[in-house]
């Protein structure tokens, strides 16, 4: 056991320095023009790996990178590993509107490792029913299918003030007779000031994608940077109340490689312990419609349920996000 602790300590020290240097470079990229890493609109493949997968993240419009609540967010926010306090298994599902995909399910598992570390695992699947085909002249052709899946594993430190995490992901996508394989990595650091303010930054989907040509243009992985700050307002303490209400306020900036300007994301979570949570978010997006989102969560014993809704006004519908987790 002593040898294991010493090994984990060495890994912690090495990765801590590496992640700090890497994320400082990533933060500098936000202030740059994007000249060296902007692929142009529509220049990425496997875009589902950058959409929200958990009900909580969807309800907050993607904000809250510095305030992950549970391991249920780990497939999109590697810093969720830093919040693993007990073993948890669960799944998330997205019910798309009429113009969306047909099925998205993700399964996750988190496990504390020793006093300061944690492991996470995730598996997700996105599927479509048969899609109407068109030839080069726009005429109807044979229908074709499309699906994608990804598997990942992560490791991180659960420090009280400073935390870090890394994840590795294998992703596969098939559209008609074209397939894409990717080997990707996520990383993040978080710093908590006392118990009321936290800062976080992540880099996601960094890695290798096999050559795949669609309409003559090569597509890259959906590499993205996100940084944010969260403040926690202890309502009960301020007003000397007996109840345990808290308000979490988050503001984030997010940029994916195919964006010519960043997204600004804002989220609010009103929490009564972990028993009852109300969430709302708003995102300012440069190349598509802005929009509000909302959701709710509650827990009973070791069972946690989450729901989120993200409207899509241009399509006249929205996506429903459902999550169920069990702690043991």
What positions do the PLM features span?
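Cleavable N-terminal export/targeting peptides
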Residues: 1-44
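Subset of outer-membrane beta-barrel
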Residues: 33-328
């Amino acid at each position: 056991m002593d040898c294991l602790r010493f090994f984990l300590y060495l890994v912690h020290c090495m990765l801590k320095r590496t992640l700090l240097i890497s994320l400082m470079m990533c933060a500098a990229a936000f202030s740059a023009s994007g000249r060296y890493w902007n692929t142009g609109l529509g220049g990425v493949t496997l875009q589902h790996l950058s959409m929200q997968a958990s009900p909580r993240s969807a309800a907050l419009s993607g904000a809250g990178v510095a305030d992950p609540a549970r391991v249920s967010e780990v497939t999109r926010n590697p810093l969720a590993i830093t919040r693993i306090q007990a073993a948890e298994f669960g799944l998330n599902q997205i019910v798309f509107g009429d113009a969306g995909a047909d099925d998205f399910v993700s399964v996750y598992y988190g496990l504390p490792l020793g006093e300061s570390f944690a492991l996470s695992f995730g598996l997700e699947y996105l599927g479509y029913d048969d899609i109407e085909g068109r030839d080069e002249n726009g005429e109807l052709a044979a229908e074709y299918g499309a699906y994608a899946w990804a598997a990942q594993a992560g490791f991180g430190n659960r420090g009280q003030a400073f935390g870090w995490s890394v994840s590795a992901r294998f992703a596969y996508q098939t559209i008609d007779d074209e397939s894409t394989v990717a080997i990707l990595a996520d990383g993040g650091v978080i710093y908590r000031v006392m118990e009321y303010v936290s800062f976080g930054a992540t880099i996601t989907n960094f890695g290798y994608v096999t050559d795949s040509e669609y309409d003559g243009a090569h597509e890259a992985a959906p590499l993205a940077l996100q940084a944010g700050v969260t403040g926690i307002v202890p309502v009960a303490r301020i007003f000397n109340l007996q109840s345990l209400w808290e308000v979490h306020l988050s503001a984030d900036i997010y940029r994916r490689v195919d964006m010519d300007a960043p997204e600004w994301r804002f989220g609010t979570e009103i929490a009564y312990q972990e028993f009852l949570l109300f969430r709302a978010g708003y995102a300012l997006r440069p190349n598509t419609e802005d929009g509000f989102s909302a959701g709710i969560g509650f827990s009973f014993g070791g069972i946690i349920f989450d729901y989120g809704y993200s409207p899509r006004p241009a399509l006249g519908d929205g996506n429903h996000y459902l999550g169920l987790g069990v702690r043991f």
